[in-house]
Amino acid sequence: MHAMESRVLLRTFCVILGLEAVWGLGVDPSLQIDVLSELELGESTAGVRQVPGLHNGTKAFLFQDSPRSIKAPIATAERFFQKLRNKHEFTILVTLKQIHLNSGVILSIHHLDHRYLELESSGHRNEIRLHYRSGTHRPHTEVFPYILADAKWHKLSLAFSASHLILHIDCNKIYERVVEMPSTDLPLGTTFWLGQRNNAHGYFKGIMQDVQLLVMPQGFIAQCPDLNRTCPTCNDFHGLVQKIMELQDILSKTSAKLSRAEQRMNRLDQCYCERTCTMKGTTYREFESWTDGCKNCTCLNGTIQCETLVCPAPDCPAKSAPAYVDGKCCKECKSTCQFQGRSYFEGERSTVFSASGMCVLYECKDQTMKLVENAGCPALDCPESHQIALSHSCCKVCKGYDFCSEKHTCMENSVCRNLNDRAVCSCRDGFRALREDNAYCEDIDECAEGRHYCRENTMCVNTPGSFLCICQTGYIRIDDYSCTEHDECLTNQHNCDENALCFNTVGGHNCVCKPGYTGNGTTCKAFCKDGCRNGGACIAANVCACPQGFTGPSCETDIDECSEGFVQCDSRANCINLPGWYHCECRDGYHDNGMFAPGGESCEDIDECGTGRHSCANDTICFNLDGGYDCRCPHGKNCTGDCVHDGKVKHNGQIWVLENDRCSVCSCQTGFVMCRRMVCDCENPTVDLSCCPECDPRLSSQCLHQNGETVYNSGDTWVQDCRQCRCLQGEVDCWPLACPEVECEFSVLPENECCPRCVTDPCQADTIRNDITKTCLDEMNVVRFTGSSWIKHGTECTLCQCKNGHVCCSVDPQCLQEL
C-alpha cells in the first residue's frame, strides 16, 4: 500500500471515529465500572472505614492495617468482566493517598495463580508495577519508577490501547510505552480484589477514592479533561492494520481459489465425464434401467441398484395358456394344442405307439398336433437293458445321457441337473427359487431369517449363497461357528500403558494405572505428590527430572553456579547467580562492548575521566585507571581532596545521608565518594527498623511464603517465580528479577528460565517487536504485513508467519495426524 493511500485511509478512519466518540462532561454508564459503589463498602465492611477524601463528590475509604477481604461477589465480578472481556481499550482510574513505605496492591484481577491485571505500588522500592498476561498467555511485569507512597493525594490513570500504555500521575504523562498486548479473555471463576492480592498478601494501606474502570479509548480524559487526545488510538490503528491484513488474506485465498478453478475448468472443457455402470459386459448410462433375469436394475450415481421383479398374472385368450419363455422371467401367453386329452404348448412334442409297436412323433404347431417325419435314430453303443425311451422323441438314449449339454433354461444362481429322461434346473446352495421351474434363484439371507448356525459370542454376516460367523470384539475363533473369550492381557494384545496393570474382562479388558501414576490406563503419567517445581518433569513415582540449573527432590533448589565453582567469569566481571542459570556482569568501572560474551570477556574499561563519570573536585586532575580512576593534584600544588556529588561540593572527610535514600551513608575521601548501606546494629535500641528490617524481632513482622508453609523473618529475601521477594515488617514485596540487558534485535525466553537470551535467527525469536513497516513476500508474491500468518500455498499443514520482514514457516504435527 502506498504511503499516500495509508494517510488518506487514516484520516478517513479518524473522521469516522470522531463521529462516534464525542464525549461531553460525563461518561456513558455502559462503559464505566464504579468499583467502590459496586462493592457497596460501608461501616459493616471489615478493615475499611469511610473518611473524607480529596473532594466531597464521592465516598472515600481508608484501607486499614487489619484483616480484611475486599473481594467482589461472583455476580458483581462477572458484571465487571462482561464489560472488560476481550476489550483492548480501557483505563484504570484511582485517586489515592498511600502511607509511607507501604507496598500494596491497588486492584487485582486474577484466576488461580494467573494475574490477568494487577496494579501495585511499592513504597519500599518507590515504583509502580503492572502485572498482566499477554495474548500468548505469558506473564509480564512493567515497572514504573515513581514515589506514590508518600502520604499525599495523587490522581492515577493507566490507559491501555492495544499494545500502547500511558501512565498519568496528577494529570501529567509520566510514562508511555509499547508493551505486549494484554489478554482480557477472562475465564469463568476469575476474581476481583480491591486493596489486596488475596486474603493474606498485598495489603494496600491508605485512602482510595474514585476507583473506576472505563472501557473506552483514552479514558484518562474523564479524570483530566484538559489532556490532549490522539486519533487514531493505538488500538484503532491495530484494528485498521488487522482489517487490511484480513482483506489481504481474503484476496490471496480468493486469488488462489480462482486460479485452481480456472485450471479445473480448462481440464473440464476438454472432456465430458459421465458416470456409468457396467454389468455382464454391458455399459449403462446414468439413470438407465434394464431387466436382468428376474430383477429390475437402474444405474444411479455409478452404482447398480436392483429389485426383484414382480410378475403380473397374464390374461390369455382361448387356445393359449401362461408359459415360461426362454430368456424371460415372467410367464407369457403361449399357443396350446389339445391331444389325447392333454394340453401341449407350441413346439412341444409327444410320442404315440401304434398297435404294431411303431413309434409315431407329434409336435404342436399352429394349435394343432402334427406328425413329425421320422428321420431315423443313431446307433447306440449300450446294451438294450441300459437304453431309455423318451416321451418327446422316438429315439432312445443310453442311461446317463447328458441332457444339460443340449439347450437348457437354467439362469442366474441356478444349475442344470440330469435326470434319466430329461434335464431340470436346481437352485445353488444358499439360494431359493423365484419361480417353480427353478430357472431363476435369489440369495437366502440366513442371518435375517435365523437359518444360520452361529453360536454365542459371534455375529452373523450374510454372504452370497452362505453366511459367516464373525467373532465379537474380545473373542477368538474356535471353529467356523464358535468363538471363545480372548485374554488380551495374557497375549499382550491390549492397549494399556507400560505403567498400567491389565485386567482381563468378559469381551475385553481394563487398564488401571500403577501406584504412583495417574491417567485413564491407556495413558499413565507419573505422579509426584509434592509436584515438580521450576519446570521439572515427573518421570516416575515421586521422581522429578530437574532442568539444568535446579536440583532437589522437587527441583526446588537453585544451583548456585557461582559459589559452587561451575563458572569462571573473566577477571573484569562478577558472577551473578540467577534462577536456573547465571550471568557474568561487568564489574564497577567496566562496561560491555556490545559483544555480550557469556563469560564476561567483552567487558571493557570505562574512561570515567573522558565521560565525566568521576567525582574529582575542580582543584584535582582525573587520571583514568583500568577499572577506575584517580584524582591527583597538579604538580607543585596542594589539593583540598574535596568531592563533587549530585552537583554539590562535599569536603574531604564529610559524611552525609542520601536525600532519596535515608538508609545509605556516603563519605568524601580524598576526592572519592564512597557510599554504603547503613551498618545495622541490632543491639542498639534506637536502630532504624526501616533500614534494618532484620533487626525487627516481632512475630507480627514475619512473613508467610506464597506456598503457605515457609515463614520468613523481617529482612529475609528469596526468589519466587522469577521475582525477587523481600519480607519487610510483615509485608511481602516482590519485584521482577533483574535480568541482564540483551542489546540484540532478536531474543527468546527459554522455557523454565526467567531472562531472555539473544538469538540470530528471527524465526526462533519470541520477543520481536512487530514493525508494521516491514513486509514479506509469500510464495505467491503476495505482500504480507509483519504479524500476519497464512497456510503455505500447495500445503495443508505448513503455517508461515511474517516476522519483521522474515518469512518463517513450520509444519504443524497435529495437522498431519488429522489428515
From Swiss-Prot:
Chain ranges of the EGF-like domain: 400-442, 443-484, 485-525, 526-556, 558-604, 605-640
Signal peptide (from-to): 1-24
Any one GO MF annotation of this record: heparin binding
PROSITE patterns attached to this UniProt entry: ASX_HYDROXYL, EGF_1, EGF_2, EGF_3, EGF_CA, VWFC_1, VWFC_2
Tissues with expression: Widely expressed in brain. High expression is observed in telencephalic and diencephalic glutamatergic neurons, while no expression is found in GABAergic and GNRH neurons.
Domain Laminin G-like: 58-231
Keyword Secreted among UniProt keywords: yes
UniProt-listed InterPro entries: ConA-like_dom_sf (IPR013320), EGF-like_Ca-bd_dom (IPR001881), EGF-like_dom (IPR000742), EGF-type_Asp/Asn_hydroxyl_site (IPR000152), EGF_Ca-bd_CS (IPR018097), EGF_dom (IPR024731), Growth_fac_rcpt_cys_sf (IPR009030), Laminin_G (IPR001791)
Pfam family, one: EGF_CA
Entry's Gene Ontology cellular component terms: cytoplasm; dendrite; extracellular region; extracellular space; perikaryon
Domain VWFC: 275-334, 641-696, 701-759
Residues of this chain annotated as glycosylated in UniProt: 56, 228, 296, 301, 520, 551, 618, 638
Disulfide bonds: 404-416, 410-425, 427-441, 447-460, 454-469, 471-483, 489-502, 496-511, 513-524, 528-538, 532-544, 546-555, 562-575, 569-584, 586-603, 609-622, 616-631, 633-639
Keyword rRNA-binding: no
Keywords per UniProt: Calcium, Cytoplasm, Disulfide bond, EGF-like domain, Glycoprotein, Metal-binding, Repeat, Secreted, Signal
Subunit structure of this chain's protein: Homotrimer. Binds to PRKCB. Interacts with NICOL1; this interaction triggers epididymal differentiation.
Designated name of the protein: Protein kinase C-binding protein NELL2
Source organism per UniProt: Rattus norvegicus (Rat)
